[in-house]
């Protein structure tokens, strides 16, 4: 499902623990790390897609997390032409995403990267909220920064990462 501007609707998930560290998944058989994300199927709301993707990619159910916030609008990124399937060229530009900030209220042991028959990740870790972006594929970095910045306001005040100090320090 691609919109008239060439963007595929998608959800992104920033999962944090009680220390406001964020979940990073290592793409299977690759050396890049990313947040869980995935397409919104026809008839799904962004929230329904988020819970489906959370289960498929991380093995977590709704009772394992609490929604802290979501982005107000779609955040978009363009995919480089050489990454686009030949049959999609000309009609597909990239992804438009609604991002969710979730708090893990379950245990680390509830995470299961093998919850689906087609796993996305082969490893995971907790990292500081304002983690360096050098391990994220380049064309997604700006959207990650925008989502992290917008959603940081939903974190517990005394544990909130300091945006003004850290956003300029993110590796480009």
UniProtKB/Swiss-Prot annotation:
<protein>
    <recommendedName>
        <fullName>RNA pyrophosphohydrolase</fullName>
        <ecNumber>3.6.1.-</ecNumber>
    </recommendedName>
</protein>
<dbReference type="InterPro" id="IPR015797">
    <property type="entry name" value="NUDIX_hydrolase-like_dom_sf"/>
</dbReference>
<dbReference type="InterPro" id="IPR020084">
    <property type="entry name" value="NUDIX_hydrolase_CS"/>
</dbReference>
<dbReference type="GO" id="GO:0016462">
    <property type="term" value="F:pyrophosphatase activity"/>
</dbReference>
<feature type="domain" description="Nudix hydrolase">
    <location>
        <begin position="6"/>
        <end position="149"/>
    </location>
</feature>
<dbReference type="Pfam" id="PF00293">
    <property type="entry name" value="NUDIX"/>
</dbReference>
<feature type="short sequence motif" description="Nudix box">
    <location>
        <begin position="38"/>
        <end position="59"/>
    </location>
</feature>
<comment type="function">
    <text>Accelerates the degradation of transcripts by removing pyrophosphate from the 5'-end of triphosphorylated RNA, leading to a more labile monophosphorylated state that can stimulate subsequent ribonuclease cleavage.</text>
</comment>
<keyword id="KW-0378">Hydrolase</keyword>
<dbReference type="InterPro" id="IPR020476">
    <property type="entry name" value="Nudix_hydrolase"/>
</dbReference>
<dbReference type="InterPro" id="IPR000086">
    <property type="entry name" value="NUDIX_hydrolase_dom"/>
</dbReference>
<dbReference type="InterPro" id="IPR022927">
    <property type="entry name" value="RppH"/>
</dbReference>
<comment type="similarity">
    <text>Belongs to the Nudix hydrolase family. RppH subfamily.</text>
</comment>
